[in-house]
């Protein structure tokens, strides 16, 4: 308990190489995906939300949402970090973005990420990669797709989601702002 209180005060290690960048992309994408999805579910379901976790049908929906949101978050953060590196550190190896992205996805099979989602994600990544402007991406709205994915995939009734759209999108963007700030402080290529 006390460790968690002081954890925020401990300086985080610098990101100095591609292996550390890969770990950052994976862990922070997972964090944003989980925190935003479960917070939204808890908010919408109220204090008895835990009771719904016994419902297999509901849990199947949550699991599907979790992986789909995470897959888009991975894409967004991968593109953001490499765009930022290119623009601020003259890092020209943006082709490494695909290598790292695929490595993360391959590792997620051990966490039971569904293969159909992995396959779909690889295709979407390639499509986005073809049209990305590395010089603009990190300065534009880099996390819009993952914000939209939470809105799309959250297992919440459509009539309620429509009322929540702006709040849901903003909650994801605010979480990404924390990650962007941390990345800028930790990167040391």
What is the meaning of each model-derived region?
Residues 61-65, 98-112:
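Eukaryote-specific, cytoplasm-facing alpha-helical/coiled-coil scaffolding segments in long proteins
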Residues 40-90:
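N-terminal interaction modules that seed assembly of large macromolecular complexes
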Residues 1-54, 64:
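Leu/Val/Ala/Ile-rich N-terminal alpha-helices, chiefly Sec-type signal peptides and the beginnings
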Residues 68-72, 76, 96, 113-116, ...:
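Residues within HEAT/ARM-like alpha-solenoid scaffolds
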Residues 50-53, 86-100, 113-117:
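Short acidic alpha-helical/loop segments enriched in Asp/Glu that coordinate divalent cations
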Residues 106-189:
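Helix-driven interaction modules
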Residues 38, 42, 78-86, 102-110, ...:
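Alpha-helical repeat scaffolds in large eukaryotic proteins
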Residues 3-10, 22, 98, 102, ...:
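Residue-level detector of alpha-helical secondary structure
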């Amino acid at each position: 308990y006390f460790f968690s209180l002081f954890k925020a005060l401990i300086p985080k290690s610098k990101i100095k190489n591609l292996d550390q960048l890969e770990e950052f992309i994976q862990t922070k994408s997972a964090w944003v995906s989980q925190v935003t999805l479960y917070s939204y579910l808890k908010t919408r379901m109220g204090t008895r939300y835990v009771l719904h976790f016994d419902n297999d049908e509901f849990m199947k929906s949550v699991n599907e949402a979790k992986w789909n949101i995470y897959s888009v978050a991975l894409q967004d953060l991968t593109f953001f970090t490499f765009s930022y590196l290119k623009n601020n550190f003259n890092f020209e190896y943006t082709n490494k973005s695909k290598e790292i992205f695929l490595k993360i996805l391959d590792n997620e099979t051990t966490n039971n990420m569904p293969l159909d989602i992995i396959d779909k994600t690889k295709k979407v990544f390639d499509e986005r990669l073809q049209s990305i402007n590395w010089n603009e991406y990190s300065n534009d709205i880099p996390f819009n797709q993952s914000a939209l994915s939470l809105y799309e995939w959250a297992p919440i009734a459509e009539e309620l989601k429509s009322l929540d759209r702006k709040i849901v999108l903003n909650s994801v963007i605010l979480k990404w702002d924390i990650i962007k700030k941390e990345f800028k402080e930790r990167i040391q290529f």
